[in-house]
Amino acid sequence: MKSMIEGVKKDGKKGRRNDRKDSWDKDGFTQRGRAEKKPVDLAKIQGIQGQIGIGKNKGDGNRLDCGMDKEEAEDGKDIMRCRHLSPGGGGMKRLLSEDVRETEGIGWESLGLGPVLLKRIRDIGYDFPSPVQVASIPHVLGGKNLLVRSKNGTGKTASYIVPMLNMINSSELSIQGIILVPIRELALQISRNVKRMSEGTGVISAPVVGGTSMQDDIIRVSNGVHVMVGTPGRIVDLVEKRVGTLSKRVILVFDEADKLLDVTFGETVTKLLDLLPREKQMLLYSATFPYFVTGFIRRYMKNPLCINLMKELAPVGVKQFYTYVKPSEKLLCLKSLLLRLSINQCVIFCNSIKTVELLAMKITEMGLPSYFIHSKMAQEDRNIVFHNFLKGKCKILVATDLITRGVDAPNTNYVINFDISKSPESYLHRIGRAGRFGAPGVAISLVTTEEKEMLMDIEAKLGKEISPLSDKGLSRLHESNIDRNQG
């Protein structure tokens, strides 16, 4: 990373700028930065469930029998079909890949949902449920504990929000549902989805996250809510203080379960489980489930049903490329990509906060306004940046892995790894930002010769070779104009 800045100099002097008085260290980085229900039609969904691997956890103590093995990914040719989908009710045309279209003939009416919620789904404009929704919703309604493995951007969120809303008794003003997520932005996003989906149902929800006023959260929850959406720490604080009334039976969702159960949050999560009523339904959702999750499942989940939809790890609609580049030429290579690609919106990932801040400045200097976001920013600033990016006020967002988990920016058609991911799991979640709900996208990684082994590790995990990006290939990408708003 040392000479990353060498490609862009001001007045012929490395690290000097005309418009600011920031000092630069020897590596060219700034020394400071800113920071009535219908019966479930099981016959209709039997076929899809037979394909995707639904079964109980064997619990042999050595591995989790929930699709840890994977098949070799297909090359992705001819997978795209034009489909009229209007998730916002706006009639937007999108290209959808087969991994979200294979349930197209199954209606929401077959899943056992009540009339109020079915009407709301129609009003929003969801044409048909995705495979993960078809596979899991009837089992959630049946009170099962679930472990669901599904690719990023395939509708996992609705697969638990919809049945949860259907099961909640709105006349009982108690906390009946808790949705745990690892990052604040995802909590706010899911909370908006719950509020939108629950319109007309009488269900009250509230986001509760760290970095915001605890007093405000206490007031909101004390006034009565049915669903809390938030990060583990803040939810534990509220439950410990006995804020709000807990129902005798709680539906507890782990979104991005692998992250919630790692060393970062594991202790807090287990504390929450001890505080909650013994009677609870637990739903775990993620694209990746490391082996350490097995111990948690054996201890806390009674007879969980495993649903695995991972025929391949990567989103089918995302084309993946890499290009070898010298560290000193990374910035120039990135500039060439940004100028030549037909970008709706793009997320550029870096491995450090310092690189994120500096790179955003450099991209803006190129005449391409960009935002940056990372965990050390004030929550208010993070909210503004993310909101503005979602609203399309800026095309380019430079970020750490903060936003790799479930965050949905539907107009993002390109992901660029300025720094290659430190782990295959991180890579998988990164590229998922460009393939939301089966839409097409492209992921490009800039790889130095020292990082070849990391690239090989990622390919081994995916079970697929990532294609090198040639100049001709780049031209083809430009000509193909991968646009999420066009069929």
Swiss-Prot record:
Its EC number is 3.6.4.13. Signal peptide: none annotated. Keywords: ATP-binding, Cytoplasm, Helicase, Hydrolase, mRNA processing, mRNA transport, Nucleotide-binding, RNA-binding, Translation regulation, Transport. It is an enzyme of class 3 (hydrolase). InterPro entries: DEAD/DEAH_box_helicase_dom, Helicase_ATP-bd, Helicase_C-like, P-loop_NTPase, RNA-helicase_DEAD-box_CS, RNA_helicase_DEAD_Q_motif. It is found in: Cytoplasm, P-body. ATP-dependent RNA helicase involved in mRNA turnover, and more specifically in mRNA decapping. Is involved in G1/S DNA-damage checkpoint recovery, probably through the regulation of the translational status of a subset of mRNAs. May also have a role in translation and mRNA nuclear export. ATP binds at residues 150-157. One of its GO terms (molecular function) is ATP binding. The Q motif is unique to and characteristic of the DEAD box family of RNA helicases and controls ATP binding and hydrolysis. The lineage of its organism: Eukaryota, Fungi, Fungi incertae sedis, Microsporidia, Unikaryonidae. This is ATP-dependent RNA helicase DHH1. A motif (Q motif) lies at residues 106-134. Residues 317-478 form the Helicase C-terminal domain.
